[in-house]
Regions:
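A contiguous, basic/glycine-rich beta-loop/short-helix subdomain that forms a polymer-engagement track
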Residues: 227-242, 260-261, 340-447, 510-512, ...
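Conserved RecA-like P-loop NTPase helicase motor core
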Residues: 447-459, 507-609
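SF2 helicase catalytic motif II
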Residues: 247, 252-253, 264-300, 378-380
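Walker A/P-loop
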Residues: 144-166
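Long, low-complexity, compositionally biased intrinsically disordered regions
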Residues: 1-143, 147
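A substrate-engagement module of RecA-like helicase motors
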Residues: 112-121, 171-247, 253-255, 307-343, ...
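Conserved helicase motor "Helicase C" RecA-like lobe of SF1/SF2 P-loop NTPases
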Residues: 481-510
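Conserved interdomain hinge at the start of the Helicase C-terminal
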Residues: 395-400, 445-485
Length: 629
C-alpha cells in the first residue's frame, strides 16, 4: 500500500486523500465509543483493511493512537495520519494532526459471551453488535463515580441485557423500573432471578375475604393490627423483592414506595427503562383527581364555583381539616373492637379507607397545587389538577438511586431529559448504533398536502385518500398500518377509501387490542387505521410490511396542559418539538424489529422536510440514514 503525501501542505497537514478515505469510511460505518476519547471502528475490505476492527484513542488536542500501527506494515507510516484517526476525528469533532501506535489497548471489562457473567442465563451466548461496548462504557462510568448515564438504544440493541449485565458484573443490587406489567413479566421471563412486585391492588385482602377489598385497601395499622399480616401475599412478595439482587417494578409502584414507604429507595443501581416516559409517569403520579362520588361518600361539598381554580385553592385547607377530624373519629371508633380483640365491621373499615384516601389527596393538594397548575374543571363529575412542569418534583425519581441508568429507543437528548426532571448533575450520554441495514427500513417522503389544523380541509383530505389508495394498490398483498394521528383523518379515510374491505379500526373492531389481534391473526392483507398506535406495538415480519404516517404528530394543543407548556417560553417550545421528533421515531420503529426484517415507512405531510431540517440534529443517526429524499 502506498501513501500519497504529495498534496500534504505542511508537516502537520493531512493529505486530502486521507480525508477522502476518512469520509468514505464514515459513509459506510460509524465509530463506537468505548470510553472517554476511546473508540472502536469497524474495518472495511473495500478500503483494504486487514482487520475487522480498530481501536483508537485521542488526547483531544490532535494526537491520536490507532491499533493499525500495531499491525503488519504500520511501522512504515511513521507519523502520518491514518484514515481511521481522521474518520473518528471528523465524527467526534476533534482535531487530528498525528497518529501513533496505540500505547495500550483498553482493558476488556466483560467476558467474551454474556452468559459468562454469573446470573446471566445460558441463552445469552453472544453479545449483540455494540452491546459489549455499551456495557463497558457503563462500568467505566460507575468506576469513575458517574451517577447518571443516559443510553439511547434502538430496537434490537438488547437494552435489558445491557443494563442487567453491567449491574451483575459490578455486583450491585438493582431496581429495574418499567412502564407496564407486561414488560415486568417479560424481564422476569428473560432473567429467572428477577423478582417482580406489582402494586398492592393486584393482591387479595386476606383479612376481609369475600369482598372486593385488595391489599391496596390494607387496614393493618398499629391501632388496628391485621391478624393475617404474616400471611399477606403482597407483603411476602415485597420481602422477596427487597431481598433480591434484581427487583422489577413499574413506575407507579416505585414512585409510591420510594417516596412514602422507602423500601426501594437508595439501591446501588436504579434503571429507568423507556426513560423518555419517566417525566410523564411522574406527571401522572403528582397529578390529582377529585370526583363528585368520592366527596359525597365522605359527605363533603365541592366549592360553590367549581369551575374556578381559585375557589378550589380556598376550599382545600378547611376541607382537609374537616376530613382529618372525621378520620380521627373513625379511628377512635375502632378502639372498642380492639380492646376485646374482635374484628371491626367491614363497613367501618371501608369508611375509614375512604376518608384516609381523601385525606391523602387533600394533603397533597394543599402542599403542591397553586395558580400555576393546570385545572380541568368543566366536568361536573370529576375535577383534575396537573402541574405544567414536574422539574420541582424530579427528586421523587432522581434521588432514590446511588447510580441511575436511563435507557430508551428515543432518549434523543440527555440534556433535555435531565432538565425536565430537574437533574442538574452531569449526565453521560451514549448512543448505540442500529444494526438494522438502512436499505431494509427506508423512510420515504411523498408530499401530499399540508395537514396542519388550518389546512386539513376537504381538498387536503381527498388528496390524502388518493395517495393512500395508490400505496395500498402498491402493497396489495401485504399488511400494514396507517398512523392517521387524528380521529378526523382516520374517519375520513375509512369512509372514502376504495380499499374499505381491507381497512380495520378501533371502532370497527371494538378495542385497540381487538383491532391489533385481527391484524396479526388474519391471513388477509388487512391494514390497521389508527390515530394512536405510534408506540408499544410490535409488528415484525409479515405482521406489517409498510406503514403510512399521514400527519406530523405534533402534541395536541387542544389539551390545556400541552398548550400552557408549549407557550411557556423557549423551554416549552423545545419540549413540544422534541416530543414530535420522539413520536415520529417511535412510529418508524413499529414495523422493522430485527436485522433481517424489512418494511417501508411513508410520510405524507408536506411540512415534513421543513420540520426534519429544523430538528435534524435531534433525530438519531439510524433514523437519519434511512430517510429518502
Amino acid at each position: 500500500m502506498t501513501w500519497d503525501m504529495a498534496n500534504r501542505k505542511s508537516e502537520t497537514d493531512i493529505a486530502e486523500s486521507t480525508w477522502e478515505r476518512a469520509r468514505r469510511r464514515l459513509s459506510k460505518t460509524k465509530p463506537h465509543a468505548l470510553a472517554d476519547r476511546t473508540w472502536l471502528l469497524s474495518g472495511l475490505e473495500e478500503l483494504d483493511d486487514s482487520y475487522k476492527e480498530y481501536e483508537l484513542s485521542s488526547d483531544g488536542e490532535g494526537l491520536w493512537y490507532c491499533s493499525c500501527y500495531d499491525h503488519y506494515g504500520g511501522e512504515v507510516r511513521r507519523e502520518e495520519v491514518c484514515s481511521h484517526s481522521a474518520a473518528v476525528a471528523l465524527y467526534a469533532g476533534l482535531p487530528c494532526q498525528r497518529t501513533r501506535p496505540l500505547k495500550e489497548k483498553p482493558k476488556r471489562l466483560t467476558p467474551d459471551w454474556p452468559c459468562g457473567i454469573p446470573g446471566i442465563p445460558g441463552k445469552y451466548s453472544r453479545w449483540r453488535p455494540h452491546q459489549r461496548e455499551a456495557v463497558e462504557l457503563i462500568l467505566r462510568q460507575w468506576q469513575s463515580n458517574g451517577k447518571y448515564i443516559a443510553l439511547d438504544a434502538p430496537t434490537g440493541s438488547g437494552k435489558s441485557l445491557t443494563a442487567i449485565a453491567a449491574a451483575k458484573l459490578a455486583g450491585l443490587k438493582t431496581v429495574y423500573c418499567v412502564v407496564t406489567k407486561q414488560l415486568q413479566e417479560q424481564i422476569a421471563s428473560d432473567f429467572p432471578d428477577a423478582i417482580v412486585i406489582w402494586g398492592r391492588e393486584n393482591y387479595p385482602c386476606l383479612r376481609f375475604t369475600n369482598t372486593e377489598l385488595t391489599a391496596g385497601d390494607c387496614t393493618h395499622r398499629k391501632y388496628s393490627p391485621c391478624p393475617k399480616v404474616n400471611q399477606c401475599t403482597y407483603k411476602s412478595q415485597k420481602h422477596r423483592a427487597l431481598a433480591a439482587d434484581l427487583a422489577v417494578v413499574n413506575y407507579s409502584f416505585f414512585l409510591n414506595e420510594a417516596n412514602y414507604v422507602g423500601g426501594f429507595s437508595g439501591w446501588p443501581v436504579l434503571v429507568f427503562d423507556e426513560a423518555d416516559r419517566a417525566e410523564g409517569e411522574l406527571m401522572k403520579f403528582v397529578s390529582l383527581t377529585l370526583t363528585r362520588q368520592q366527596l359525597e361518600r365522605c359527605q363533603i361539598e365541592p366549592p360553590e364555583y367549581k369551575t374556578k381554580l381559585d375557589a378550589w385553592l380556598k376550599w382545600a385547607e378547611p376541607t382537609l381539616s374537616k376530613v382529618g377530624g372525621e378520620l380521627n373519629r373513625l379511628e377512635a371508633g375502632l378502639e372498642p373492637y380492639l380492646e376485646v380483640e374482635k374484628e371491626p365491621p367491614v363497613e367501618l373499615m371501608r369508611e375509614l379507607i375512604r376518608y384516609q384516601r381523601l385525606h391523602s389527596k387533600l394533603k397533597m393538594f394543599t402542599t403542591c397545587v397553586d395558580a400555576r397548575w393546570v385545572s380541568e374543571l368543566d366536568d361536573p363529575e370529576k375535577w383534575q389538577f396537573k402541574p405544567t412542569f414536574v422539574r420541582s418534583f424530579g427528586h421523587m425519581l432522581a434521588e432514590h438511586g446511588q447510580r441511575i441508568l436511563a435507557m430508551s429507543a428515543t432518549m434523543l437528548s440527555a440534556r433535555d431529559w435531565a432538565y425536565n426532571l430537574g437533574i442538574e448533575d452531569e449526565v453521560t450520554f451514549h448512543r448505540v448504533p442500529s444494526t438494522f441495514p438502512r436499505e431494509n427500513r427506508p423512510v420515504i417522503h411523498l408530499p401530499t398536502a399540508d395537514f396542519s389544523l388550518k389546512s386539513a380541509n376537504g381538498e387536503a383530505l381527498m388528496l390524502m385518500v388518493r395517495m393512500v389508495d395508490g400505496l395500498l394498490d402498491k402493497h396489495k398483498a401485504q399488511k400494514g398500518i396507517i398512523h392517521a394521528v387524528s380521529y378526523k383523518i382516520a374517519k375520513y379515510l375509512l369512509e372514502h377509501s376504495r380499499h374499505q374491505d381491507r381497512l380495520i379500526s378501533h371502532s370497527e373492531a371494538g378495542t385497540r387490542a381487538e383491532a391489533l389481534r385481527r391484524l396479526i391473526e388474519s391471513e388477509m392483507p388487512l391494514v390497521l387505521v389508527s390515530p394512536s398506535f405510534g408506540r408499544g406495538v410490535d409488528l415484525f415480519g409479515d405482521r406489517a410490511r409498510f406503514q403510512i404516517c399521514v400527519k406530523i404528530p405534533f402534541p395536541d394543543l387542544g389539551d390545556k396542559q400541552t398548550a400552557k407548556r408549549r407557550w411557556s417560553g423557549k423551554a416549552g417550545e423545545r419540549w413540544y418539538l422534541l416530543e414530535t421528533v420522539r413520536a415520529i421515531v417511535q412510529m418508524a420503529g413499529r414495523i422493522v424489529r430485527s436485522a433481517d426484517d424489512w418494511g417501508v415507512t411513508y410520510i405524507l405531510d408536506e411540512r415534513w422536510p421543513r420540520f426534519y431540517h429544523q430538528m435534524e440534529r435531534d433525530f438519531p443517526l439510524w433514523f437519519r440514514e434511512a430517510c429518502v429524499w
